[in-house]
Amino acid sequence: MKLVRKDIEKDNAGQVTLVPEEPEDMWHTFNLVQVGDSLRASTIRKVQTESSTGSVGSNRVRTTLTLCVEAIDFDSQACQLRVKGTNIQENEYVKMGAYHTIELEPNRQFTLAKKQWDSVVLERIEQACDPAWSADVAAVVMQEGLAHVCLVTPSMTLTRAKVEVNIPRKRKGNCSQHDRALERFYEQVVQAIQRHINFEVVKCVLVASPGFVREQFCDYMFQQAVKTDNKVLLENRSKFLQVHASSGHKYSLKEALCDPTVASRLSDTKAAGEVKALDDFYKMLQHEPDRAFYGLKQVERANEALAIDTLLISDELFRHQDVATRSRYVRLVDSVKENAGTVRIFSSLHVSGEQLGQLTGVAAILRFPVPELSDQEDDSSSEED
């Protein structure tokens, strides 16, 4: 993301002009734009024209509109963002108050104005404009007959290819059908890797599986690379890292990211930090339950006691339509930071973010036990009963 201009007043009102440069920037933009903001961008509008003879026709014209945002729609797989709203500035083609939908595009600038720029949104702009936050991890999660080829960016896990091949069971004295199907499966996975992984950007490719599938696959891939003189695969062989995962399903990627070998290789990436924080939370919940809580009320009470060491919070909560609720989460983040706590904002498009979402989207690891929080939890549950 490129920051063109930033004009924010002391009261935190103002506007920024940005240029999304890659697909992931559309996800950052989705998290920046909120209902009630004003968005100015170039767009296509269909307009009716009347000729001197009285015949009516229609043309598509490019014009610049400023909308008061009413709805935002994001397609995570296509990385497309559509913003619907009403026109709030005079325009020769569009009446004031008329509805229009702007489709924001990579490499086309837009200006976003808000009455209140909060700390979470401003931090996201800083991160989005930092080149160190680019996608640098890929993963192949596989089992016999099933594989997912994923890109792990700082903000999301993107499934780029799913490979499924029916593998017949081995039969006594006749393994040829099984072996042919397995080779066909491996070949399709290799093709998916070559099609979807950019080795100029990616620093590490995780190959995760149960059993010996990963070893057998890597042996096949590099034997074929030698035979066909595939320089791209051979030159990047050192980037492939084999790790254990319980299955070839996407959710098993979390296990691979938790592997200590992987964690050391990816120690500087946001994704690895999220995975470790969530893993630490689960361990604390199991071994010292008085130091691990989830749910907004419990976490707010822990914050009032100045007990929060690490706050885990989903970015989905900052997209809440209700301004008061959204502000409540922002205040929580600011307060934890002021009290020297660590804040981890999880992407809801990451496997770890999906898991945090199942725990209400907000959780905390405490510096010291707060037993009365557990008592309050028990009281509230008994009242519900």
From Swiss-Prot:
Q: Which domain of life is it from?
A: Eukaryota
Which residues fall in a coiled-coil region?
A: none
Looking at the keywords, is Magnesium present? no
Q: Which GO terms describe its molecular function?
A: metal ion binding; nucleoside-triphosphatase regulator activity; ribosome binding; stalled ribosome sensor activity
InterPro entries, per database record? eFR1_2_sf, eRF1_1_Pelota, eRF1_2, eRF1_3, Pelota/DOM34_N, Ribosomal_eL30-like_sf, Transl-rel_pelota
Tissue specificity field: Ubiquitously expressed.
Question: Which co-factors does it depend on?
Answer: a divalent metal cation
Presence of the UniProt keyword Cell cycle in the record: yes
The compartments listed are:
Cytoplasm
Q: Its function?
A: Component of the Pelota-HBS1L complex, a complex that recognizes stalled ribosomes and triggers the No-Go Decay (NGD) pathway. In the Pelota-HBS1L complex, PELO recognizes ribosomes stalled at the 3' end of an mRNA and engages stalled ribosomes by destabilizing mRNA in the mRNA channel. Following mRNA extraction from stalled ribosomes by the SKI complex, the Pelota-HBS1L complex promotes recruitment of ABCE1, which drives the disassembly of stalled ribosomes, followed by degradation of damaged mRNAs as part of the NGD pathway.
Family, per the entry? Belongs to the eukaryotic release factor 1 family. Pelota subfamily.
Q: How does it assemble?
A: Component of the Pelota-HBS1L complex, also named Dom34-Hbs1 complex, composed of PELO and HBS1L. Interacts with PINK1. Interacts with ABCE1. Interacts with CNOT4.
| Protein name per the record | Protein pelota homolog
